[in-house]
Amino acid sequence: MELKPNVKEIPGPKARKVIEEHHKYMATTTNDPNEYFLVIERAEGVYWIDVDGNVLLDFSSGIGVMNVGLRNPKVIEAIKKQLDLVLHAAGTDYYNPYQVELAKKLVEIAPGDIERKVFLSNSGTEANEAALKIAKWSTNRKMFIAFIGAFHGRTHGTMSLTASKPVQRSRMFPTMPGVVHVPYPNPYRNPWGIDGYENPDELINRVIDYIEEYLFEHYVPAEEVAGIFFEPIQGEGGYVVPPKNFFKELKKLADKHGILLIDDEVQMGMGRTGRMWAIEHFDIVPDIVTVAKALGGGIPIGATIFRADLDFGVSGVHSNTFGGNTVAAAAALAVIEELQNGLIENAQKLEPLFRERLEEMKEKYEIIGDVRGLGLAWGVEFVKDRKTKEYATKERGEIVVEALKRGLALLGCGKSAIRLIPPLIISEEEAKMGLDIFEEAIKVVSERHGYKIH
């Protein structure tokens, strides 16, 4: 049966009961019963079906996890096959061929033609924690640079790198010492008021100069910095695409001072941007790459892929229990195969459709301040006023709700942006359908608040 968005009542009676019980028994995280009231029972292709039978087109990919589809048959087949062999083989103490096969594949597809090794874990946070330890151990340095707007995890180590929302650090000090944050080259919003679309080189120079002339000249000893953590496109910070040459200049700076470049591909890797890795758009080879989310196709897994010469070399410095889980490894291998069998090309093919439609919406609706993206990773930022760029956070939430009521699942990012990240299996027809619903939601909210529509 061919599915299409079909919503009768959301949240329906069954959903309301689940939401009520959830908040009674589950710890408070990021669930919002007023905005994200989707209670998922099952999935098919690019559609969620909720407990009341509502069908919703997914433009969230389960927060960037389900790139190869919400229930990919090849991934499910690989998982079932592995379940008949072995579920867990203690991969950091005993040996198993499944994790080795995955590590070989990750080294094969990693950016650049250099010798690498892999540490397997269960999440993006753990992948970044491993990167922290690899960088400290291999350089014998203790400091790091990260970017304002970044998200690298929520454990105490990675939380010290994260800087997208103050609430993520609230009552959590002290975090890991030695992390300094600098402005990300956001073409739309930056401390210098530079239009980074019109003057990308000026924006790049300001960020690089800030690191060289303010950090290194005044209070951060460059020779004590182990690594620079970055997202090639900031995710939780608002789906911010930096100027194309930024990472080339950052690499020059890093190489000059012997600093490792650590590329967090947790949200933007695995074909999301129309390349296997988002950093491939920027023509540099990072020293360490971290990946998770979409790697497992729904099964928890993380990986830290690093230059082989950075390896610990001493048993016991770092390890874990579930890293290299056999089922997760089987799922990840199936995901990579699916991506290489046309899904990355599909993201490339649909990029012009998203770019054109979203730019048209920006021209039409004054509430849209900025549109940015690559492949099937798009951010639309909403503002109260295009001149002041005042955040339209409340209106952003209303757009998410109106879309949900019409059968489109979205997620916010940044202070007032929405990310559009459908599974890479989405067809052109489904993409157009989702964009139509998105525009309808924008129109309804614009009319409600009196924003100009051209």
Curated annotation (Swiss-Prot):
N6-(pyridoxal phosphate)lysine carried by residues: 293
Activity at various pH: Optimum pH is 6.5-7.0.
Positions bearing the site annotation: Plays critical role in maintaining high affinity for the substrate: 93
Cofactor(s) recorded in Swiss-Prot or TrEMBL: pyridoxal 5'-phosphate
Gene3D superfamilies, A to Z: Aspartate Aminotransferase, domain 1, Type I PLP-dependent aspartate aminotransferase-like (Major domain)
Activity relative to temperature: Optimum temperature is higher than 90 degrees Celsius.
Catalysed reactions listed for this entry: L-ornithine + 2-oxoglutarate = L-glutamate 5-semialdehyde + L-glutamate; L-lysine + 2-oxoglutarate = (S)-2-amino-6-oxohexanoate + L-glutamate
EC code: 2.6.1.13
Keywords: Aminotransferase, Pyridoxal phosphate, Transferase
Organism domain of life: Archaea
InterPro entries in the cross-refs: Aminotrans_3, Aminotrans_3_PPA_site, Class-III_PLP-dep_AT, PyrdxlP-dep_Trfase, PyrdxlP-dep_Trfase_major, PyrdxlP-dep_Trfase_small
GO MF entries: identical protein binding; pyridoxal phosphate binding; transaminase activity
Binding locations of pyridoxal 5'-phosphate: 124-125, 267, 321
Signal peptide, first to last residue: none
Assembly and interaction partners: Homotetramer; dimer of dimers.
Domain notes per entry: A 'Glu switch' mechanism prevents L-ornithine from binding in an orientation that would lead to transamination of the alpha-amino group. The side-chain of Glu-236 forms a salt bridge with that of Arg-419, closing the 'Glu switch' and thus preventing unsuitable L-ornithine binding.
Function: Catalyzes the conversion of L-ornithine and 2-oxoglutarate to L-glutamate semialdehyde and L-glutamate. L-ornithine is the best substrate, but the enzyme also shows good activity toward L-lysine, and low activity toward D-ornithine, D-lysine, 5-aminovalerate, 6-aminohexanoate and GABA. The enzyme activity is specific for 2-oxoglutarate.
PANTHER family xrefs: AMINOTRANSFERASE CLASS III, LEUCINE_METHIONINE RACEMASE
Family: Belongs to the class-III pyridoxal-phosphate-dependent aminotransferase family.
NCBIfam families: PRK05769.1
Name of the protein in its database record: Ornithine aminotransferase
Source species: Pyrococcus horikoshii (strain ATCC 700860 / DSM 12428 / JCM 9974 / NBRC 100139 / OT-3)
